[in-house]
From Swiss-Prot:
The gene is trpF. One of its GO terms (molecular function) is phosphoribosylanthranilate isomerase activity. Pfam families: PRAI. This is N-(5'-phosphoribosyl)anthranilate isomerase. SUPFAM superfamilies: Ribulose-phoshate binding barrel. Pathway: Amino-acid biosynthesis; L-tryptophan biosynthesis; L-tryptophan from chorismate: step 3/5. Belongs to the TrpF family.
Length: 209
């Protein structure tokens, strides 16, 4: 079965167009101002205009304040909420209040970090645990040791993220069996600027994995 793909941190019409044309399944927009990939709700709504079902729009939020996600939803109907630096209890509160699927990020550095259950959210995004001095919770081009996923066969939905590129993603899919892969910095020409050619190469590599 071919893994599904999320292209995250989209902030240009060209990157959105390349993602759609290349066959991405999820298109992600970052609503975290410190990120070089951040967009406003209005910018995301304009960029998302060409996106139609079954493609899904994912909004990434980092420890959001009360009302922050709702403010975005008033401009752009998202299909999935992706949460970073949010405890399980808070994630479940948001899931119930927003009535939308929630993906929760989990930092992975070693096998002991692998989750045993989803905690009640719709999927867990397994990303490399950021370094203590990292300014961002993800999108740092950092991978964890995929070999620890060799026997990982959870009953819940999960996504592989962290350090994926067009050159590494096929091997990552083969080694981990990831049902969904998530890329951001791995398809950028410079920090925060997506390269449509790299997006196309990444999507092609996943299809041929």
């Amino acid at each position: 079965m071919v893994a599904q793909v999320k292209i995250c941190g989209l902030n240009s019409a060209a990157s959105v167009a390349a993602s759609i044309a290349g066959g991405a399944d999820y298109l992600g927009f970052v609503f975290f101002p410190p990120s070089p990939r951040a967009v406003t709700a209005q910018e995301a709504a304009s960029l998302a205009a060409p996106i139609a079902q079954p493609l899904r729009k994912v909004g990434l939020f980092v420890n959001p304040r009360d009302g922050e996600i709702e403010a975005v939803l008033r401009e752009l109907p998202l299909d999935i909420i992706q949460l970073h630096d949010v405890p399980v209890a808070r994630a479940l509160q948001l899931r119930e209040r927003l009535a939308l699927p929630v993906w929760r990020s989990v930092g992975i550095a070693a096998a002991d970090d692998l989750p045993r259950d989803s905690g009640g959210v719709d999927a867990l995004l397994l990303d490399a645990k950021p370094r203590p001095d990292a300014a961002l919770p993800g999108g740092n081009g950092q991978a964890f040791d995929w070999s620890i996923l060799a026997d990982f066969a959870p009953s819940f939905a999960w996504i592989l993220a962290g350090g994926l590129t067009p050159d590494t993603v096929a091997d990552a899919v083969r080694r981990t069996g990831a049902p969904i892969v998530d890329v951001s910095s791995g398809v950028e020409q410079s920090r925060g600027r997506k390269d449509p050619a790299l997006i196309r190469s990444f999507l092609s590599a996943v299809r041929n994995a």
